[in-house]
């Protein structure tokens, strides 16, 4: 029997294990809507109590819906720009770099040192996938990004709702100072949801939602150097998972309250 690896994380970093578990569980279904071989492999090696994630079906559905939406957006970008540089901010245990392997020149997974200490135990990433163990609010991480004018894609998934508006501004300011052009796919949460909705697994991990924005147009007011090209509601991913969303997804209130991927461009 293979020895399992025990990890100690709490607060926001703990959510990365819950989302990893959600992707692994979906991938093991006969009729899976995403397939994440790396997630299955890592979960099988972890000595960790996944009961919080197992009991939170709403969180799991949201994770898979988000994965469906982002995989399409990232895949579409890379099909147009096969020599792109991709930056995954607050990557956690995300494995999209493997699902998109061969479609980009360089991929940088960026997260806090304590998070990357866990990631590096399961993923050896030394090119063309690289790890940067720094905060996205620490401008020095840009020193580790090799850039020669290639198209740039930045992914910010599952992060902004745990930050302040000042933090979000700082992240985009660092991007603005480094790149003359860039596309950012950033997940946002409705202010109403931040204030009134609680996910069971998130609450149990001691992570707290703290910031939200209505849509990409409102986000543009916060970061005016980046223009909102469009918003993609996670309802689009839910339509794949649950056909009833093809009906209820037309209700504006449902779309308003759902998380969005805002496509921001400089």
Report the location of each language-model feature:
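Short, glycine-/aromatic-enriched active-site segment of Class I SAM-dependent methyltransferases
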Residues: 191-207
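Core SAM-dependent methyltransferase catalytic element
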Residues: 239-266
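Short alpha-helix
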Residues: 206-236
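Short amphipathic alpha-helix with an adjacent loop that forms part of the alpha/beta core around
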Residues: 140-149
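Conserved beta-strand signature within the Rossmann-like core of class I S-adenosyl-L-methionine
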Residues: 178-191
